[in-house]
Design a protein with these regions (language model features):
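Conserved hydrophobic/aromatic beta-strand scaffold that supports enzyme active sites
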Residues: 15-17, 131-135, 148
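Short, conserved beta-strand element in jelly-roll/cupin
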Residues: 116, 123-141
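General alpha-helical segment detector with a strong preference for membrane-spanning helices
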Residues: 18, 120-122, 141, 154
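Non-heme Fe(II)-dependent double-stranded beta-helix
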Residues: 1-13, 19-115, 121-124, 161
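Structured loops at beta-to-helix junctions and adjacent beta-edge loops in soluble globular domains
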Residues: 21, 105, 118, 135-137, ...
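Double-stranded beta-helix
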Residues: 141-168
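Short, charged/polar surface micro-motifs in flexible loops or helix N-caps
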Residues: 83, 107-109, 138-141, 154
Length: 168
């Protein structure tokens, strides 16, 4: 599934793209899980009497973490063959789940995410890890896809200081 060219691109540039590798069944699972998790976030917002929890903003953007074991079917996706193949192709045969999250932006009114390196938020030295980003809806640059910064464009392979954007 992952070609030698994609593996080399990961080494050279820090990323590769697997286009249309999720089955319709998997997409439906991920979409349904996202809906369930957003409903749970709304319930928690209601309980707390707020429209914002951390960087989740009601009906605009949601950041929902560490829930793979709490929605039926997600565990099988997270620990399934596709993720195993990605891990083996990038960081080797020994991989461990470090963090799982949904980032969902509402159509037309979603909030931006500030540019960041995922590792920049950790604040401690760590072993290499891989971030897998899977779109569950059709996307374009205009409607909010992720933007990657290849090594060759940035000119370095190290972390940079992160400045929090209060608007995002």
């Amino acid at each position: 599934m992952i070609s030698d060219e994609q593996k080399q691109q990961f080494i050279d540039e820090g990323y590769f793209i697997l286009d249309s590798v999720l089955s319709n069944e998997t997409l439906e699972l991920l979409r349904g899980a996202c809906d369930i998790l957003i409903d749970r976030m709304h319930s928690e917002m209601d309980r707390l009497g707020t429209d914002q929890i951390h960087i989740s903003h009601r009906n605009q953007r949601y950041h929902i973490a560490k829930q793979y074991a709490h929605v039926e079917g997600l565990k099988e996706y997270v620990f399934g063959e596709l993720m195993a193949d990605i891990c083996k192709a990038t960081i080797g045969k020994n991989a461990y789940l470090f963090y799982d999250q949904y980032v969902a932006k509402a159509a037309e009114v979603g909030r931006p995410f500030a540019w960041h390196q995922d590792g920049g938020y950790l604040g401690f030295p760590h072993t290499p890890y891989v971030t897998v980003w899977a779109a569950v809806d059709d996307m374009t640059a205009e409607n909010g896809t992720v933007t990657l910064l290849p090594y060759s464009d940035v000119g370095i392979r190290s972390l940079v200081d992160h400045i929090r954007n209060e608007e995002s």
